């Protein structure tokens, strides 16, 4: 009894399998190929490619799947990306349903030219093509219920408008817009087959400069002047990998900036070495900047990498200007200031010497209503006048104080400016009288050497010694005010500290 029931159940469940096997065998059987041919001919006979399925009825629902093979290139210059994919569309066309053969019919790709297919296009497409090796990569598969599966292998270059303000620390959203070109939502509808699983292969993609962080599937309708159209969007979120730029741009810029600071340790009088180093680093930074601009589009705003390279260029250029300042102070401004200070001190000392000499050798005296200028030496050490001066006192008298009164003074030999009593070129050294008739000169009892040559020489020697001391002091103190070594020492600290602060602010701002 049990065996009979068991055999009965087995016969019921195995019947469809037997029918399918028989049908498959009949289809593959060359003698039954005529049945398949008749079925296809019947489907295509009288088929009007000009009319959509269910014309005049509800809109055709077209489901789409995408299997991404690769993303070949993302170009910042052209603002686009290249995508290779297997693009599949499925819809139901009752005119293509059949029940004679319970199997799917995969037909030659040329049959697609005889069937109605959706007028799908990529809205942001720049250039696309269907692969044709070894034959045109198209597939048509018919199901018994009239479902049509239409597959293509396509490579498309789609526009992707990028915001490069944070380049190369940026994230970009690139989309693929799929839309019907002629049919409105009254005739056709688009949807993603399998919902979130409609797009596959994203996780397997590896890009040299980007990582795919996420992707989204969007279904919407857009309205134009000609009507409302269905649209599907596939949006990729791409994050740029910074490793390449650290090795190719950031690290060379940092090292070149640090290299420019080596000039602070080179002696300030080594002009050739410091100037050559500064100019080399400036030109290298310019080359890096130029190469980077060639790989990016000409956009009106400043990018993150532009800010960094501009900062490095400023530091390199300032290092070169630092030596220009040092060179000017050491070889230009410093000696000029020393020379001016020395001249000013010498003029002040000469003026003071004149005043001291006048006070020492001339004394105004007024006696008996007559004003005299007396030549005297407070030290008491008098010396005879220079031999180059020859006086002839033709008339003289003695006053009660034993001073010689000269009524006539004849100077036989004119005194040169350089042969004056003080050697200062003062014309007053030859004028001994306030009035035209008499001069009080010296006491008669004093010897001829009372004109003080030794005292004058000692006084001049003291002034010269004092001037030398002041000049030596100037020579020591002036470089302290503009010390080139101090500028280099401060630069060794200032430049690295400010550059480190610049890097901290830059990376905190752009990374976060």
From Swiss-Prot:
Record PTM text: Glycosylated.
Cell compartments where the protein resides: Postsynaptic cell membrane; Cell membrane; Cytoplasmic vesicle
PTM-bearing positions, type Phosphotyrosine: 441
One cellular-component annotation, GO: GABA-A receptor complex
Glycosylation sites: 32, 104, 173
Binding locations of histamine: 121, 180-181, 226
Family annotation (Pfam families): Neur_chan_LBD, Neur_chan_memb
Family: Belongs to the ligand-gated ion channel (TC 1.A.9) family. Gamma-aminobutyric acid receptor (TC 1.A.9.5) subfamily. GABRB2 sub-subfamily.
Extracellular side: 26-244
Regulation: Allosterically activated by benzodiazepines and the anesthetic etomidate. Inhibited by the antagonist bicuculline. Potentiated by histamine.
UniProt name for this protein: Gamma-aminobutyric acid receptor subunit beta-2
Matching PROSITE patterns: NEUROTR_ION_CHANNEL
A GO BP entry: gamma-aminobutyric acid signaling pathway
Binding site for 4-aminobutanoate: 181, 226
Disulfide bonds: 160-174
């Amino acid at each position: 009894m049990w065996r009979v029931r068991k055999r009965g159940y087995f016969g019921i469940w195995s019947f469809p399998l037997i029918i399918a096997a028989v049908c498959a065998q009949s289809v593959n059987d060359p003698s039954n190929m005529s049945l398949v041919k008749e079925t296809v001919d019947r489907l295509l006979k009288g088929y009007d490619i000009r009319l959509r399925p269910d014309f005049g009825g509800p809109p055709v629902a077209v489901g789409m799947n995408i299997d991404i093979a690769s993303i070949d290139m993302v170009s910042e210059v052209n603002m686009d990306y290249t995508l290779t994919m297997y693009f599949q569309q499925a819809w139901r066309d009752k005119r293509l349903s059949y029940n004679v053969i319970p199997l799917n019919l995969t037909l030659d790709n040329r049959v697609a030219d005889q069937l109605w297919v959706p007028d799908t296009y990529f809205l942001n497409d720049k250039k696309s093509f269907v692969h044709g090796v070894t034959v045109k990569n198209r597939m048509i598969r018919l199901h018994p219920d009239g479902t049509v599966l239409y597959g293509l292998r396509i490579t498309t270059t789609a526009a992707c408008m990028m915001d490069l303000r944070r380049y190369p620390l940026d994230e970009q959203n690139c989309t693929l817009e799929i839309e019907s070109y002629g049919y409105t939502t009254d005739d056709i509808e688009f949807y993603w087959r399998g919902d979130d699983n409609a797009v596959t292969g994203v996780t397997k993609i590896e890009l040299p400069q980007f990582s795919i962080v996420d992707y989204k599937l969007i279904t919407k309708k857009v309205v134009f002047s000609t009507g409302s159209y269905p649209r599907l969007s596939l949006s990729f979120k791409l994050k740029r990998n910074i490793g390449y730029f650290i090795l190719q741009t950031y690290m060379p810029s940092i090292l070149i900036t640090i290299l420019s600071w080596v000039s602070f340790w080179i002696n300030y009088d080594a002009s050739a070495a410091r100037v050559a180093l500064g100019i080399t680093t400036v030109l290298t930074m310019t080359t890096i900047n130029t190469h980077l601009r060639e790989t990016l589009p000409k956009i009106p705003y400043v990018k993150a990498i532009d800010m960094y390279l501009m900062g490095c260029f400023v530091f390199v250029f300032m290092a070169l200007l630092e030596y220009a300042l040092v060179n000017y102070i050491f070889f230009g401004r410093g000696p000029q200031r020393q020379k001016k200070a020395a001249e000013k001190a010498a003029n002040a000392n000469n003026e003071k010497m004149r005043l001291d000499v006048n006070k020492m050798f001339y004394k105004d005296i007024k006696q008996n209503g007559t004003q005299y200028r007396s030549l005297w030496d407070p030290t008491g050490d008098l010396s005879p006048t220079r031999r180059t001066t020859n006086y002839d006192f033709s008339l003289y008298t003695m006053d009660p104080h034993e001073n010689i009164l000269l009524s006539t003074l004849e100077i036989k030999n004119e005194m040169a400016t350089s042969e004056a009593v003080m050697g200062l070129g003062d014309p007053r050294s030859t004028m001994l009288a306030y009035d035209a008739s008499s001069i009080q000169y010296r006491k008669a009892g004093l010897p001829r050497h009372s004109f003080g040559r030794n005292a004058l020489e000692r006084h001049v020697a003291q002034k010269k010694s004092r001037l030398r001391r002041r000049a030596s002091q100037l020579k020591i103190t002036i470089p302290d005010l503009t010390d080139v070594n101090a500028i280099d020492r401060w630069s060794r600290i200032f430049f690295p500290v400010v550059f480190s602060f610049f890097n901290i602010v830059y990376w905190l701002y752009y990374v976060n």
